[in-house]
Amino acid sequence: MGLIKKQIEFLDKFTKGKWTLNEKTGLVDIEGDFDCSRNKIERNYYGGVKALSDFKEVKFGVVTGNFYCVHNTIKSLKGSPQEVGGNFNCSYNNLTSLEGAPQRVGGNFNCYHNKITSIKGAPQDIGGDFFCSNNNLTSLEGSPQRVKRFFGCSNNNLTSLVGGPQEVDDFSCGGNPLASLVGAPQVVSGYFSCTNTKLTSLEGAPLEWKGNYSDFYRNPISEDTINLVWKTMRKNKIDYRTALISLKGEIPAKDWKKMSSAL
């Protein structure tokens, strides 16, 4: 089945490179980039920009470069590429789900500033960063288990990190109502940040951290206490409860009162 006029115009307008239609599958492959972000759309007579709400029923197959559809009103990723060689960015839309997202992304995957409630459907093979911050996530179930670079899930409604990746370079989970780090990645080779949460327990904190910078400010427990307990856990390869008991008398009374409830 061929493409209709509006679909051809859509592809011609936003493709930087060459697009081809696979007559057997009905999928459009692109050798190059595709960018239908709002800033790429022509302004109307009054200076406004009409955002896209969908992909004009075009179904994409493989995009060798980047695929961008940022700052629109897209509600579904149905029809988006199955594979992207570069970056995939669908941020600042009205998405509530990642169903239909590409399953392989060679670069970064960005879906921040949407209304996404579940990460299920997210790509499992990612070559770069994974950003899902500023959504309505209550769970990380469905996340890729290994992210080669940065994983950011800040500013959601997460009360647990269960289901998230277990191996990352950098990790940020700030701005969530987390009381502990249960489910956090166990191998972090770079930056680790957990700021502005309800953290009163380091249960689940990674025991293998090769980085040189971390953030724990604006939590119920002081940053100094958190770093002391975490360092003790890592140095001695012991769990949170054991580390806490070993530090009794060294932790300020205010922090001890909040943390000792785990004992």
Indicate residue ranges for each PLM-predicted region.
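Canonical leucine-rich repeat
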Residues: 44-45, 52-58, 77, 84, ...
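Leucine-rich repeat domain C-terminal region
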Residues: 196, 207-241
